[in-house]
């Protein structure tokens, strides 16, 4: 039972355990075991203690031997062995450990709460890295979760023996001394408590614990009323963060901040000094989750490799202002590159990051972003600026040495019905992303930069969207795209259903326009060529307004065994067009220009399907097997649409899903004529827990009429597939060996030509319980593309040639796809993994990308070394094939866990893009 002493409550809160007599009111010249007294508090608040009746029968414990400073019976301080300022003989200094834990304190590092892996519980193993030989486990102790402020918390004290000198007001404790106040606990072999100064002196195996932190030392001074402490020859541990280190002395402030003099910081195991930060002054703030250090050297195996006058680093996963890990690179067009990001934790709901990027060959690129989160919105602003000192592109068209980028991404809701969205990126010149990298979140390299803002209203049965969308070209190898300025859509369903009928409507009013570039393009060598926009001819040069109305009525009928949905749809489209003189003079065969065009097309369809299932057993496992046949009839009469330009329309890629669409074109500028009957069937194998083991679908369409409606310049009579009576067979297959193994395939076979139109097969393996293992094997083939050829200004069916035979930049089958892709990350021995990818183009007999290397991963650091070959794309010509060239590089990435990446951020980038499952592997890694 603990007794409370009111006399000392104000300055020295103290509770005495049943095994100790402390603050004895009578001056004694001898020490006795506390177990021999019965103590209680008198009415005046003083102690009332009397010897137990059987005291004489009990052997007293031996008097503790004081190795260093002790308090004598007359209150004087004596020294036995060494002076107070020196370490006792045989004590190892932390500076002699060279970044490792002190084995002299415990051979198994148990003094740092280190628990070997084989002794961890299942729950502790789940929180421990796969390559860690153990973990720091904070022992359960009384008061560890006590939230009482130090000034209000009583003190609990325990020891094997004690004495108290009343005149000097000093209590001496010896033998397994334990003092606890609030959440803080201090252990030592002996202690001297000075009541008048509220100060304690502790010696021998000192351990201070508080809020997931442990400090171990040889001796310590403790301020009893505030919890301030100084521990000499100290080692420390932050359990949850797996952080440890040492210092000549460690100070714990009243607010629990830890300050280290000539200290170290690492996440490595106690017996490892793979890397450490060593600084004159290190501060660790558990309240904020960050630390700082001055005059810092990064040491590898106790060898200094990097110096910085100041560093700011995380000690857990919370946000805080400060420098982020730098990135260092060399080579390429930018030369030596150094990025030193600085993070501003401005508020819980908004922050900012500055990315100064020094490039030896270009200068200083200043880039930054600001992120915000409100009750109804989220987003970010970003920008970058560089006065480019590299003049390689000074002769190229559209280049500007003053290079900049701005970006705004926003999603918000004014209330539950009104939504706003902004995605806007602009750059100074089309070569920006080819020459410069960006660290901004959500900004990616693409040929067309989106510049869009929209306002959406969601009603109970409809939605209305006001949209403005433009594109900025980030390439010179594409024609200028159309902008939607503005676009208004209204789509919904009428709220009543007479006789089960369903009335839907889709409406759109939009303005399409673009400013085509004229004149010549100058490449980096000063050579002149015609701009690609000059190849655009006829109605393709038109701007205009489009109004599209598409009401429909259907009768959905659903049963447990199937469904039947007849549907009638009517599409009316009105155009108001503008066409320049060049367009009028270059009309394609059959085209006629009229400023006003309209089109009306009825669409009739019947969609139906049945559902059969049965219980079955396959290789000893129970399944629910389904058979789902589907029949879809579509009739769309032919309407001449030759005089209508194509603003946002292309032909859909053929696959199993396209068999059941009511328009073979995407967009509203073409409504494909069709009289067809599509047949398909799907077979599934489903386990009792809902896991779909495999799925197989096959289908084909029967055509009763030719498909005469085509894209501009394409003649249906020249297309075998437009005159065929049947479509290709469309197959889809997926098999999951388990939740770790997956195989996907699609295959389209043309029975007329007896050839494959397109196909792919992909095998993916990544165990849920061990995501470090990744295997991908895939093959793709496609030769049925319908695309727009920028070099000729014409739509091309199949083949995929770039340009025309005889032209200077002609490349046969440039767009034809016939590739395999193999990638793997596989542990070969503990801590070592193989990393590899090989992507090969059979059509052009070239390797697109290949890399191979290894990864070493342990408890506190990771390294990757990768040799890579890839096809680089750097635009100096409008002809895309001419801008491709092979490149090679050896890439090194080093990650110090708990500190961040030292170098090699680009390795992470191309591994993420090239290996499916890599990001999941990293997200789940310890």
From Swiss-Prot:
Annotated region (Disordered), positions in chain: 55-91
Entry keyword Signal: yes
Record's keyword annotation contains Membrane: yes
Gene3D superfamilies attached to this UniProt entry: Lipopolysaccharide (LPS) transport protein A like domain
Pfam families found in the cross-reference section: LptD, LptD_N
Signal peptide: 1-22
Compartment(s): Cell outer membrane
Domain of life: Bacteria
This protein's GO CC annotations: cell outer membrane; transporter complex
One of the GO BP terms on file: lipopolysaccharide transport
Keywords, in A-Z order: Cell outer membrane, Membrane, Signal
Extent of Low complexity compositional bias: 68-91
Subunit structure: Component of the lipopolysaccharide transport and assembly complex. Interacts with LptE and LptA.
Family of this protein: Belongs to the LptD family.
PANTHER family assigned to the protein according to its UniProt record, in alphabetical order: LPS-ASSEMBLY PROTEIN, LPS-ASSEMBLY PROTEIN LPTD
Functional description taken from the UniProt entry: Together with LptE, is involved in the assembly of lipopolysaccharide (LPS) at the surface of the outer membrane.
Protein name per UniProt: LPS-assembly protein LptD
